[in-house]
C-alpha cells in the first residue's frame, strides 16, 4: 500500500514539473512573439 502511495506522489511531482515547464515555455514563446 505504501509503495502505491509513493509511486503516486512521484508521478504527481513529475506531472506538476512538466506542467510548470510547459507553462514557462508558453510564456517565453508569447514574450518572444510580442517583442
Curated annotation (Swiss-Prot):
Keyword annotations: Chloroplast, Electron transport, Membrane, Photosynthesis, Plastid, Thylakoid, Transmembrane, Transmembrane helix, Transport
Gene Ontology CC: chloroplast thylakoid membrane; cytochrome b6f complex
Main location: plastid
MF terms (GO), sorted A to Z: electron transporter, transferring electrons within cytochrome b6/f complex of photosystem II activity
Compartments where found: Plastid, Chloroplast thylakoid membrane
Transmembrane spans: 5-25
Entry keyword annotation includes Kinase: no
Single biological process term from Gene Ontology: cytochrome complex assembly
Annotated InterPro entries: Cyt_6/f_cplx_su5 (IPR003683), Cyt_6/f_cplx_su5_sf (IPR036099)
Source organism superkingdom: Eukaryota
Membrane topology: Single-pass membrane protein
Entry similarity comment: Belongs to the PetG family.
Function text: Component of the cytochrome b6-f complex, which mediates electron transfer between photosystem II (PSII) and photosystem I (PSI), cyclic electron flow around PSI, and state transitions. PetG is required for either the stability or assembly of the cytochrome b6-f complex.
Subunit structure: The 4 large subunits of the cytochrome b6-f complex are cytochrome b6, subunit IV (17 kDa polypeptide, PetD), cytochrome f and the Rieske protein, while the 4 small subunits are PetG, PetL, PetM and PetN. The complex functions as a dimer.
Protein name in UniProt: Cytochrome b6-f complex subunit 5
Amino acid at each position: 500500500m505504501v509503495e502505491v502511495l509513493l509511486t503516486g506522489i512521484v508521478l504527481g511531482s513529475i506531472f506538476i514539473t512538466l506542467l510548470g515547464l510547459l507553462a514557462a515555455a508558453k510564456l517565453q514563446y508569447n514574450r518572444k512573439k510580442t517583442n
